[in-house]
C-alpha cells in the first residue's frame, strides 16, 4: 500500500535524480532538490502519468502547477483533487 506522499517521493527521485532521504514534505523542488524550470515541468508531467489511469486522465493545469513548490504542496494538491492513499 503506497501513500500519496510515497508515490510523489518515488516520482521525484526518478525525475530529479534526488536522494530519497532528501525528498521530505518540506523540501522545495528548486531550492532543496535542485530542479530547474524544465525539471519542474517534467515532474508535473510525470505526476500526471503516475496519478492518471487509462480511463481517467489526470491533468494539473499550468496555473496550479506554478504554485506547487514543495513536496507537501503537491501531496496536499493531489489529495484536494480526490487522490487517496492506495
Swiss-Prot record:
Which biological processes are named by the entry's GO terms?
lipid A biosynthetic process
Domain Carrier, first and last residues per copy: 2-82
Recorded hits in Gene3D superfamilies, A to Z, give: ACP-like
Q: Which residues carry this modification: O-(pantetheine 4'-phosphoryl)serine?
A: 37
- Chief location category: cytoplasm
Its subcellular locations are: Cytoplasm
Q: Which GO terms describe its molecular function?
A: acyl binding; acyl carrier activity
Q: Which domain of life is it from?
A: Bacteria
Fetch the InterPro entries from UniProt. Answer: ACP, ACP-like_sf, PP-bd_ACP, Ppantetheine_attach_site
Task: Report the pathway entry.
Answer: Lipid metabolism; fatty acid biosynthesis
Q: Which Pfam families match?
A: PP-binding (PF00550)
Disulphide-bonded residues: none
Q: Which keywords accompany this UniProt record? A: Cytoplasm, Fatty acid biosynthesis, Fatty acid metabolism, Lipid biosynthesis, Lipid metabolism, Phosphopantetheine, Phosphoprotein
Q: Which GO terms describe its cellular component?
A: cytosol; membrane
Q: What is the annotated role of this protein in its UniProt record?
A: Carrier of the growing fatty acid chain in fatty acid biosynthesis.
Instruction: Spell out the family assignment given in the record's similarity comment.
Output: Belongs to the acyl carrier protein (ACP) family.
Q: Identify this protein by name.
A: Acyl carrier protein
Species whose genome carries this gene: Dehalococcoides mccartyi (strain ATCC BAA-2266 / KCTC 15142 / 195)
Q: Which gene encodes it?
A: acpP
